From Swiss-Prot:
It is a multi-pass membrane protein. This is Cytochrome b6-f complex subunit 4. Signal peptide: none annotated. Residues 1-35, 116-130 are cytoplasmic. The lineage of its organism: Bacteria, Bacillati, Cyanobacteriota, Cyanophyceae, Nostocales.
Length: 160
């Protein structure tokens, strides 16, 4: 806030510029052509130049070539499917695993009905929804990390 300087509207030069439609966006400078024609292409080309420079200077390694005759011990899904994979892998009954996965959206649907007397939007004033969100986030992270461990170390994350 200390770096912002308010314009001096008593300055006749500034008032003349504003009367002609010149000045800062805050004072009604039109987006066309000022931003859309001049500023946006510069930002887009600068971003493109950064991406090209990074790809030329530090190319990503593709990895080792695939060997169709040697499969890994355990094939893992993509990282965003780790929690679901962990539920299916650790629960002995697969139907129970599918029901556990279906209970997540059903539980999220029930949260507004559990806390229907609280009309606040501030998360600190909605303790039930905040607690459920934080608990679900921690369980999801725990399941996601546990999916990368062998099955015997998956619940303790290899710590104990």
């Amino acid at each position: 806030m200390a770096t912002l300087k308010k314009p001096d509207l008593s300055d006749p030069k500034l008032r003349a510029k504003l009367a002609k439609g010149m000045g800062h966006n805050y004072y009604g400078e039109p987006a066309w052509p000022n931003d859309l024609l001049y500023v946006f292409p510069v930002v887009i080309m600068g971003t493109f130049a950064c991406i090209v420079a990074l790809s030329v200077l530090d190319p990503a390694m593709v990895g080792e070539p695939a060997d169709p005759f040697a499969t890994p011990l355990e094939i893992l899904p993509e990282w965003y499917l780790y929690p679901v994979f962990q539920i299916l892998r650790s629960v002995p009954n697969k139907l129970l695993g599918v029901l556990l996965m279906a209970s997540v959206p059903l539980g999220l649907i029930l949260v507004p009905f559990i806390e229907n007397v609280n009309k606040f939007q501030n998360p600190f004033r909605r303790p039930v929804a905040t607690t459920i969100f934080l608990f679900g986030t921690l369980v999801t992270i725990w399941l996601g990390i546990g999916a990368t461990f062998p099955l015997d170390k998956t619940l303790t994350l290899g710590l104990f």
